[in-house]
């Protein structure tokens, strides 16, 4: 049994929530929270007839730590599942620490303003010197490691599809299916365009940043 607060109700979050509701014996209660509550309500109404999971909804601004704390303290989840934008990772982690709740996300933190002088200095030092060209870096979230350890809490990072599910598939294959593996190629694609003239497999802005950046090997 578990009680999970899901923050986010976009394309990725909707799929993750739908999958959770297929395993009602594990995800017994879900609260879907987003800046736009009507989107949460619509998804809850769509899923409710097909699941035993108890679904509730809430409105929250994930940029506001106090709002997040108020919601977490009111709902009292076992886990906060952050499927909002990566710009909001740190505020949600701060709220989880303040409220004593475990944390999980699907995408590593990056600042919304990549021209911010403080961030640029860290980016130049930690990312560019290491050969990275994408506008993100796990060091911001790794800085929370001791805080979560001291609080007796777990923060599970990067549990999306790639990275995330693909790593689990690779680890399973290496352990159970193959004697040895030399290389693994991972290709991202969509299952159709879903009626959109421009269909990405994640948040369009972030997707364009990623595919236009030189690869790091």
Predicted regions and their residues:
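Rossmann-fold NAD(P)-binding glycine/threonine-rich loop
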Residues: 107-153
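Rossmann-fold cofactor-recognition segment
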Residues: 49-64
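Conserved N-terminal Rossmann-fold NAD(P)-binding element of oxidoreductases
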Residues: 4-11
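N-terminal Rossmann-fold NAD(P) dinucleotide-binding loop
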Residues: 13-17
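Conserved Rossmann-fold cofactor-binding substructure of NAD(P)-dependent oxidoreductases
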Residues: 60-77, 84, 88
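Helix N-cap at the beta1-alpha1 junction of Rossmann-like dinucleotide-binding domains, i.e.
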Residues: 35-39
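Rossmann-like dinucleotide-binding core of oxidoreductases
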Residues: 139-217
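Short beta-strand element of Class I
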Residues: 29-31
């Amino acid at each position: 049994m578990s009680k999970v607060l899901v923050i986010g109700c976009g394309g990725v979050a909707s799929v993750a929530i739908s999958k959770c509701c297929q395993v009602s014996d594990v995800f017994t209660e879900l609260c879907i929270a987003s800046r736009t509550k009507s989107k949460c309500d619509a998804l809850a109404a769509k899923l409710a007839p097909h699941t035993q999971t108890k679904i509730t909804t809430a409105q929250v601004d994930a940029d506001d730590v106090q709002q997040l704390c108020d919601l977490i303290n009111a709902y009292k989840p076992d886990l906060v599942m952050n499927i909002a934008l990566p710009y909001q990772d740190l505020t949600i982690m701060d709220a989880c620490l303040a409220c004593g709740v475990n944390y999980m996300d699907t995408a590593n933190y990056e600042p919304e303003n990549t021209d911010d002088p403080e961030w640029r200095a860290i980016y130049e030092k930690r990312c560019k010197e290491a050969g990275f060209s994408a506008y993100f870096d796990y060091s911001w979230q790794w800085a929370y490691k001791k805080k979560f350890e001291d609080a007796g809490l777990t923060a599970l990072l990067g549990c999306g599809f790639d990275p995330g599910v693909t790593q689990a598939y690779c680890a399973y294959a290496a352990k159970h299916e193959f004697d040895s593996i030399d290389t693994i190629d991972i290709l991202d694609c969509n299952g159709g365009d879903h009626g959109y003239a421009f269909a990405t497999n994640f948040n369009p802005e972030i997707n364009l940043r990623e595919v236009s950046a030189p690869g790091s090997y």
